[in-house]
Amino acid sequence: LYDQILEGMLDFIDGDDDADYTSSDVEICGSLLSKFISSVPEGISHDKAMVEVKTLVLALNELNEQCDFSLIETDQREGICELVFQTLAAAGVEFDEDVTEDWREW
């Protein structure tokens, strides 16, 4: 899933489309996602996990804004949300709603 998200972003750059972001922006996005995954270990408290979600989402908001709101499109948004949900589930954090929605601007 992680690779699919980033490959989708890179494919847009490589295509005929005129992207408002660079491969460096995609690398930054990948770093943010990797940092999130590693910051949510198994057994993390729900409250601490939500702090990590908020940190990720706000950082992605800022990055996407710097890219003229074109880095995170529908496919990437869905993939990022799914990656967040899978990471939380693997850590044993229960949730019953979209935990990114309160902060997400993409």
Place the predicted regions along the sequence by residue.
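Short terminal alpha-helical segments
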Residues: 1-41
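Mature extracytoplasmic domains of secretory-pathway proteins
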Residues: 33-63
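Surface-exposed polar/charged interaction patches
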Residues: 8, 12-16, 39, 43, ...
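Short intrinsically disordered, low-complexity coil segments enriched in acidic
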Residues: 1-4, 49-53, 104
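Short, well-structured alpha-helical segments
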Residues: 30, 50-53, 97-101
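Non-transmembrane, amphipathic alpha-helical segments
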Residues: 17-25, 41-48, 69-72, 76
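Generic structural signal for well-ordered, non-transmembrane alpha-helical segments
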Residues: 27, 34, 54-61, 78, ...
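Amphipathic alpha-helical binding modules
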Residues: 67-106
